[in-house]
């Protein structure tokens, strides 16, 4: 079960694609995904040696729901996402009647709030259920709210409050967690959450990986600058502002910060100017 899955992308779609395209080198996969990236998937799969092991099933949603998904913070999406997960469960049930499965894997989205229903299918047919990697941090660090606007402070504190309630009280989350043969935690914070709220030990496995590459070590001792690369979405949660503030406070004229990502670039450009580091 991989709601967002696409080659050539980052974030959730790229994460899921890298999981399934690499698992397919060792396993035959039956992958249920949303239909937004169907064209990309069907263009690339035939070019892969392991493509013969990748069988995609599509459960598409409307363009309006897709916009809600991409607009992170639009909580209306969870209603439709839950409905999508139920339809996916029914589709998976039909697939299991035809194909023999060894594992049911709930891959993404990685947030714990919506665990899908493959755990229920596991209860019904006895096929082992695996969940994760899962992001189950119990709170956004409130120290990061320093300098944030009132709206952001209220939103993040409300989110922290609701997250705590869901970790303690969500029946479906707890059922999924206890049905799982294994849960992979995407972070040490998530590990602590599963242990604290559900008494479950979960191995640590970050959702993103990398391809091991060998490059010659370059001697950079003669460089005039110290270059730092920051990659991410330019929004409050990723704390680019903290990186800019750190550069400003360092007072190091040789420090250069290279920023790659999408989002509110104008805001962070003006913030850099206000710190007097726009040329860095």
Description of each model-found segment:
Residues 1-52, 123-127, 182:
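N-terminal subdomain of nucleotide-sugar transferases
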Residues 134, 219-238, 244-249, 258:
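Conserved donor-binding/catalytic core segment of Leloir-type glycosyltransferases
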């Amino acid at each position: 079960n991989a709601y967002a899955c696409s080659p050539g992308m980052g974030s959730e779609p790229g994460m899921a694609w890298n999981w399934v395209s690499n698992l397919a080198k060792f396993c035959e996969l039956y992958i249920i995904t949303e239909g937004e990236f169907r064209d990309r998937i069907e263009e690339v799969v035939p070019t892969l040696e392991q493509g013969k092991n990748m069988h995609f099933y599509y459960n598409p949603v409307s363009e309006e729901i897709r916009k809600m998904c991409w607009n992170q913070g639009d909580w209306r999406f969870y209603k439709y996402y839950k409905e999508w997960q139920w339809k996916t469960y029914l589709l998976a049930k039909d697939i299991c009647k035809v194909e023999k499965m060894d594992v049911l894997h709930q891959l993404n989205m990685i947030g714990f709030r919506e665990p899908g229903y493959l755990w229920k299918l596991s209860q019904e047919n006895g096929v082992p259920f695996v969940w994760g990697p899962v992001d189950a941090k119990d709170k956004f660090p409130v120290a990061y709210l320093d300098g944030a606007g009132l709206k952001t402070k209220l939103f993040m504190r409300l989110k922290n409050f609701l997250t705590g309630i869901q970790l303690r009280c969500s029946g479906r989350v707890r059922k999924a967690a206890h049905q799982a043969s294994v849960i992979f935690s995407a972070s040490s914070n998530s590990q602590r959450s599963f242990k604290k709220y559900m008494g479950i030990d979960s191995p640590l496995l970050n959702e993103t990986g990398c391809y091991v590459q060998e490059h010659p070590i370059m001697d950079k001792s003669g460089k005039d600058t110290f270059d730092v690369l920051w990659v991410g979405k330019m929004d409050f949660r990723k704390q680019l502002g903290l990186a800019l503030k750190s550069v400003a406070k360092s007072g190091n004229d040789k420090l250069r910060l290279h920023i790659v990502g999408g989002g509110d670039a104008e805001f962070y450009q003006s913030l850099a100017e206000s710190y007097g580091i726009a040329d860095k």
